Amino acid sequence: MIIVGLTGSIGMGKSTAAGMFRELGVPVNDADEVVHMLYSGEAVAPVEAAFPGVAKGGVIDRAELSLRLVAAPERLAELERIVHPLVRAKEQEFVARHRADGAPFVLLDIPLLFETKAEARLDRIVVVTCDPEMQRERVMKRPGMTAEKFAMILKRQVPDSEKRARADYIVDTSDSFDVTRQQIRAIVDDLRAG
């Protein structure tokens, strides 16, 4: 089974691209969705222990946690030491399940693919990109996004140019959904061809 990683800097259209892969029948494991699930399950106790007061009603209040991290960005590594191993375990379960089902390939949607050295466990890498102005416009429309928060996120991410240089496939979402869908269909066809 081919294990494909999907990544892209914030606002590049990675979630949209992942949805298009799903539409074509590709099993997709979304690391962000896994984190959301963990924030109402296994991660609650250890995150609350490290960041007292961020759990409300048995769920991690992501807005509160985000505020704490903007105020103390050096604590992000501490959060990642808690959450990343849990996300990785769920990813391994996903891969094992689809391998047992005989899937020819799966897609792992990993926002911090290069930053977490995930490429070592992947066979192919798809990078989603777009024009930098479009990226900024998309990101600044998000609820609760500030220029400070956007800058903090970008600072933590491998630059888009480096991601593209390390990719096996590039999906440029600067154009229409139809053009993006055509690029993704070509990748899926190539992967199915072996």
Curated annotation (Swiss-Prot):
Q: Read off the CDD domains from this record.
A: DPCK
Q: Which InterPro entries match?
A: Depp_CoAkinase, P-loop_NTPase
Localization? Cytoplasm
- Which GO terms label this protein's molecular function in UniProt? ATP binding; dephospho-CoA kinase activity
Keyword field: ATP-binding, Coenzyme A biosynthesis, Cytoplasm, Kinase, Nucleotide-binding, Transferase
Please indicate which superkingdom the organism of origin belongs to.
Answer: Bacteria
According to its UniProt record, the EC number is 2.7.1.24
Pathway assignment: Cofactor biosynthesis; coenzyme A biosynthesis; CoA from (R)-pantothenate: step 5/5
A Gene Ontology cellular component where this protein is annotated is: cytoplasm
Tell me, which GO biological process terms does this entry list? coenzyme A biosynthetic process
What the entry lists under SUPFAM superfamilies is as follows: P-loop containing nucleoside triphosphate hydrolases (SSF52540)
Indicate which residues the UniProt annotation says bind ATP: G11, M12, G13, K14, S15, T16
Q: Where is the DPCK domain?
A: 3-194
Q: Which family does it belong to?
A: Belongs to the CoaE family.
- Function statement: Catalyzes the phosphorylation of the 3'-hydroxyl group of dephosphocoenzyme A to form coenzyme A.
HAMAP family on file: Dephospho_CoA_kinase
The name under which this protein is listed is Dephospho-CoA kinase
Source organism (scientific name): Rhizobium meliloti (strain 1021) (Ensifer meliloti)
